[in-house]
Amino acid sequence: MIKKSLLPLALGGFGIGMTEFVMMGILPDIAGGLDITIPQAGYLITAYALGVVVGAPTLVSLVAKRPPRSVLIWFMLMFAVFNALSALAPNFGLMLVSRFLAGLPHGAFFGVGAVVASRLADEGKVAAAMATMFTGLTLANVIGVPLGTYLGHNFSWRLVFLIVAAIGLLTAISLRQWVPVIEARPSAGFRKDLGIFRKPGLWMALAITSIGTGGFFAWFSYIAPLLTDLSRFAPGQIPMIMTVVGVGMTVGVVLGGRLADRFAPIHAIVILLTTMTALLAMNGLFATSQTAMLVLAFATGANALAMGPPIQMLLMEHSREAEMLGSSLGQSGFNVGNATVAFLGGI
């Protein structure tokens, strides 16, 4: 039975997952609407990812002494405003800025949210509680991304970002109603918190996160043109395939939580990185087979999100003196990989 207090974290994860991953499905629509090329539109993915990289440690450091619940509420209000700006952006330049701003609270929310989930979790169920939050992100790929892709193709991509903004506002309200007040743990100060960066184990975890997930983001950033140009799927079939990916992600994050609770996080990560390498290779080998790509869409999505809980636990293990800062770095690491491959793909 999922605790009611964890549901707002899942809802926030849903909104964040939708705004990040729906871009892959509506990239051609945005390109057409702003009169730019698809590779240029890919820079919007890079801008959002850079916002995550910058925002996660910066925002968390600024609010380290504040109660986590109030911090999460403010992050979601920022998220709502900046996604509304994306919906209203009249040109590529302003859209680029709005996507960067929308990315700022992303990693910070997951970083603080992971700490809140760990404090609300029953004994021995910390990774499972974190997985509940990440389940919202994966459900976005089952429901939100296909819906957003459909709306972007058939109505307007701007409507998609307005819906995301509304989800952010609803999350802020539910956080206030359902999440108990949790006192901030004493902070030694910003400079001392930065001492966690002297730990080799933290850098190892960040390298695993950014480099290890780069291949997945390279695949996912350009999944729509990959499926239409090489696999010969019709554009109208892309929402269905995004649903398949999302179902895989949902299954994967649950399995990842169980793996991380049962085994040492680093052991789980090694297994998952090995299988991800094999899956990405098969995506290249069987790109012209529609049947194979449907199976691989599910498996690749599952493997990618299964890495979330063990990576989050590994980061927290190496940053106990500044748990919110350390936890937020996971999303920075993920999006270093995301920003890099989206940029390289747009060249």
Q: Language-model features: where?
A:
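Conserved MFS/SLC helix-loop-helix module at the cytosolic interface between two early adjacent transmembrane helices
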Residues: 54-93
